[in-house]
Amino acid sequence: MTVENAKALFFERNLCALTPLDPERASAFLADLEARAREEELAGVVALLGRKKAADFLSAILDLSPFIREALTRQPRILDRIVSATPESALEAILDEISASGTVAGVSESELMTSLRQLKREAHVLIALCDLARIFNTETTTDRLTDLAEACTGAAVRFLLLDADAAGRINLPDRSNPEKDCGWIVLGMGKFGARELNYSSDIDLIVFIDETKPAIGDPYECVDTFSRLTRRLVRILQDRTGDGYVFRVDLRLRPDPGSTPLAIPVGAALHYYEGRGQNWERAAMIKARPVAGDRLSGKQILAELSPYVWRKYLDYAAIADVHSIKRQIHAHKGHGDIAVRGHNVKLGRGGIREIEFFVQTQQLIAGGRFPELRGNQTVPMLARLAERGWITQQARDALAQEYWFLRDVEHRIQMIADEQTHILPEDDEGFARVSHMMGYADPAEFSEIFLAALKVVEKQYAALFEQAPELGAASGNLVFTGDVDDPGTLETLSAMGYERSSDICRVIRTWHFGRYRATQSAEARERLTELTPALLKAFAETRRADESLLRFDGFLQGLPAGIQLFSLLQSNPRLLNLLVMIMSAAPRLADIITRNPHVFDGLLDPAIFSEVPTRAYLEERLRAFLGSATDFEEVLDRLRIFAAEHRFLIGIRLLTGAINGVRAGQAFSDLAELMVGRALEAVEAELQRRHGKVKGAKVALLAMGKLGSRELTAGSDVDLILLYDHDKDAEESDGEKPLAPSKYYIRLTQRLIAALSAPTAEGVLYEVDMRLRPSGNKGPVATHIEAFGKYQRNDAWTWEHMALTRARPIHGDEAFIARIKVDIEDVLAMPRDVRKLAGDVREMRELIAQEKPPRDDWDLKLKPGGIIDLEFIAQFATLAGYVKKTPRPFATEEVLANLDPFFADPAMVDGLVEAHRFYTNLSQAIRLCLNDSAGLDQFPPGMRELLCRVAGLPDIERIEYELLEHYRLVRAAFDKLVGHGAD
């Protein structure tokens, strides 16, 4: 407040000369106001408007501020308050009326709402008039706006306390002073707490409950009681009625607002801040101040929070915290020039936020050691920082001057329409309104002065952080503090390629609130904060940035801890890029690591990409992983964990190109053999514990299908047949609960199937398919070796002999396995009518084509000329004796490569082998990335890039062309070798 004429009436003082945009329009507005004053018989106001000084000043304001014009025209008695009283005393009278309104006997909630809205409008207009006239300086304006908000909040709180007491929900110790010891703590935050409110501010509140206070009734109901009161408080202040609103209320600065009640017990709040409080919350608490309710308890909780806000020692961790906040607020180095029109006075470059943050960061670093630096107001703290030598006198003076200048501009932007905006209008008239209200009739002059102010602030702000480590991963605002979307951040995310910027902001704020196990520790959140710009940049470089980042969020939700992974990603760009590749290209792998985050642990092995996963490699690691585990369930759980991790790691090698599709098929098969064999051993031991052994028992597992040919893909089930033998005189097992041999091995097989395929907390080992056993699902699940041989020699269909070409014993008694191999080779070597064989194969292929037609050109298996045709050629050639290699190969590609020249000429063989390898590389990648069969339109963009890489081709169109060529070649070969050309 200016000292001169402090006791003079408003229009007796020296007023800032303002000029309207349109003098004629201004005169018309003044005439309308005079007419309204006459209607309400306000003789003093009519006389005032007849005086030139008042008329000139008010007509300019009526033209420049539509909001003030509407308020005065609607309520001209506002001016009557300053006809015979000083503006200071008039404002005090309004504040007194507001304060008393909450305790008026018999007043209803709706009556209070009406009274507060009308009185607030009167005070608002008076403060604006004093501000525009320069009767109040900017500091006084913010102070009076804060007084107004505090009076309104206090009145509403007192009304609600008395109402709750009358209803018996609380027990006030003193109804004449309802706030005393009520236990309802209302803290003002941000500009409200710092007494720096702007003209159209929201008021930021945090509400706590002191459960120890006598007013609290049932402590188990107090959260619900005071949350209801808080909700009513918001309604009283915020709801729009015919009289407008009082103040918009924001409760989102409370701890974890997405999952906590509106009113939080003090103990729960302290626990949150001590364990999960974030950097920005430390900064926010600097400005916290009790503004209503139980103020004594409010001061006590702030005192208890002091060690959290003010760290005792100045250390590198504290400085790193500050830099972390800085990166969340701005990362704009290298941006273009500042544009005045459309500039955000609060959040833009050189704006108010930078000055506030300049002060708060110094306070966070030094306030622990120097209590005098713990104030909650910006400009006084600039002075304290200069006194302590933390900033220069020049910086203090420059920033203080520009702070009040920018706050002035902010107020005038908001005075136009009473909207909470901080953006300078871009249109000529809107910009001129602000310029004129600032006292500049020439907008160009105002523009020049405004730009100079921004540059001063930007220079000081940049100097403060010139030593801050740069992530170099993003440009533009990246602000994820609080619970409100930052407009600049939304723009930055959109520019980076995100389509759902608001959703992405919400997700990242969830990380910061520590709602996931991986982000509950302060250190983990700090690491993730450091990593976030790099993550955003990496995901933005995929073609579906939003989808990929949301998959990463799902991964975080399942992660048991985060520090190690976040540190690893931060220090290892290759691993970060790999994770992004998984999220963008391989939904199936992303789902796996989301459900089982432990599989990612394998990537900590630095040799993961250089060592090929051979059977010996896997055996060595399995032995170490199982260790001394002997308990049946423990062994199975360890097998499940091991299998999940190594399936994932084989997939990662394929994804990154460390191995090709053929090698991946071999590795997936080797892993499955080990897992199935070790599971059988565990099941046998468990069965023997209860039922003993069968005399002369011999057991073996026969791998069929792709496991037999060592061509498993990611997610393949395993085709198995369990074969057994025993002494002829064995009638039952020798255990406590003996079983007949046939029942014994059926029980063994059933338990093996359960061990492999039962869903558990650690997942499923493998889905098992045993339909290739003799008689399929109609036959027993375990097959005696003699029954197996007899069936294959006498009763098996051609398709069963085709399947037998891929049969391979993978686990069991060595002598028994040797016998099985001989039996299989004898069956395969049986003399056959080649023409009938070819006819059977053709008939089977035609049946498949009818019952399972190909989905599209990407159905590599079922498409004519696809994988089935190649497998049928290989199986037909094996049964017909057209494979020249000994011992007989199992893998389709190896069979094709060894076709007898008189059956298929070398050029055809080369074409078939090339086609099979092309299909294998593509199908392995597709099965790795997707859970289900899908067409091209469902392939994620990152997966398309992967397919181009594994195919060695530049684009999808070229792959499709090559596919069609291979289909044509293979189909022609099938027709020649197996089709009617073979007859």
From Swiss-Prot:
Domain of life according to the entry: Bacteria
Cofactor(s) needed by this chain: Mg(2+)
GO molecular function, one term: [glutamate-ammonia-ligase] adenylyltransferase activity
Record-linked InterPro entries: GlnE, GlnE_rpt_dom, NT_sf, PII_UdlTrfase/GS_AdlTrfase
Enzymatic reactions: [glutamine synthetase]-O(4)-(5'-adenylyl)-L-tyrosine + phosphate = [glutamine synthetase]-L-tyrosine + ADP; [glutamine synthetase]-L-tyrosine + ATP = [glutamine synthetase]-O(4)-(5'-adenylyl)-L-tyrosine + diphosphate
Stretches the record annotates as Adenylyl removase: 1-468
A Gene Ontology cellular-component term: cytosol
Keywords: ATP-binding, Magnesium, Multifunctional enzyme, Nucleotide-binding, Nucleotidyltransferase, Transferase
Region (Adenylyl transferase): 473-983
Enzyme Commission no: 2.7.7.89, 2.7.7.42
GO biological process: regulation of glutamine family amino acid metabolic process
Family to which the UniProt record says this protein belongs: Belongs to the GlnE family.
NCBIfam families (alphabetical): PRK11072.1 (NF008292), PRK14108.1 (NF010706)
UniProt-listed HAMAP family: GlnE
PANTHER family listed in its UniProt record: BIFUNCTIONAL GLUTAMINE SYNTHETASE ADENYLYLTRANSFERASE_ADENYLYL-REMOVING ENZYME (PTHR30621:SF0), GLUTAMINE SYNTHETASE ADENYLYLTRANSFERASE (PTHR30621)
Function of the protein: Involved in the regulation of glutamine synthetase GlnA, a key enzyme in the process to assimilate ammonia. When cellular nitrogen levels are high, the C-terminal adenylyl transferase (AT) inactivates GlnA by covalent transfer of an adenylyl group from ATP to specific tyrosine residue of GlnA, thus reducing its activity. Conversely, when nitrogen levels are low, the N-terminal adenylyl removase (AR) activates GlnA by removing the adenylyl group by phosphorolysis, increasing its activity.
The protein's name: Bifunctional glutamine synthetase adenylyltransferase/adenylyl-removing enzyme
Gene this chain is encoded by: glnE
